[in-house]
């Protein structure tokens, strides 16, 4: 066995802020203990980025901003969100946004008998404010050395666009931002060995770059 997905989830201890001293110490203890046992971490709902990954590179990636999951129970992330993150959150290090949803209208999910309503904002109108092309481009734009195909398996089976995920190499050794403006658009190219990957995205305004 080369890898195991495990972890824990739970509420905050009473009286403690998510980014307060209690949780910062807990977070650091988790990172140090994982390093001791040669365990890589992909953390969701982390504390603010502090540069700890420079000391403990086993802290491979983290969420730390509104990720893809936000689209499941709200009006969703607006189109400009994806082209703001490279200029804000991603300056602090890799982000596990979990891009790559193919069923952007949730047509299969809405008809599922197992669907669970999270809150009043989670309605039949929920969708991802994106295109399929942008979902694929975000694998390049929103850098993370560990990427996952976050949609249901049924939405990938037989889909020709899934070939990009098969070909993609997240272990990039060179990156360059070719063009962009915060919240407007971004164009990023990355190299992994002899492979080059280019991702470009815009907000809700059409444009040529």
Predicted regions mapped to residue ranges:
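Aromatic- and carboxylate-enriched substrate-binding clefts and catalytic-loop regions
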Residues: 1-122
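Carbohydrate-binding surface patches
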Residues: 182-209
């Amino acid at each position: 066995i080369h890898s195991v997905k495990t972890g824990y989830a739970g509420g905050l201890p009473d009286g403690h802020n998510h980014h307060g001293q209690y949780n910062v110490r807990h977070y650091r203890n988790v990172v140090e203990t994982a390093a001791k046992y040669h365990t890589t971490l992909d953390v969701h709902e982390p504390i603010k980025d502090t540069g700890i990954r420079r000391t403990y590179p086993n802290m491979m990636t983290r969420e730390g901003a509104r990720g893809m999951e936000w689209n499941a129970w709200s009006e969703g992330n607006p189109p400009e969100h994806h082209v703001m993150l490279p200029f804000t959150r991603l300056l602090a290090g890799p982000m596990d946004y979990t891009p790559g949803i193919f069923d952007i209208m949730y047509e299969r999910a809405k008809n599922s008998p197992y669907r669970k309503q999270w809150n009043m904002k989670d309605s039949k109108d929920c969708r991802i404010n994106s295109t399929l092309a942008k979902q694929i481009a975000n694998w390049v734009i929103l850098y993370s050395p560990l990427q996952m195909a976050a949609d249901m398996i049924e939405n990938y089976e037989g889909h020709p666009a899934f070939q990009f995920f098969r070909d993609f190499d997240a272990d990039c050794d060179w990156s360059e931002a070719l063009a962009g403006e915060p919240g407007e658009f971004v164009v990023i190219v990355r190299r992994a060995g002899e492979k080059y990957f280019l991702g470009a995205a815009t907000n809700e305004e059409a444009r040529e770059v």
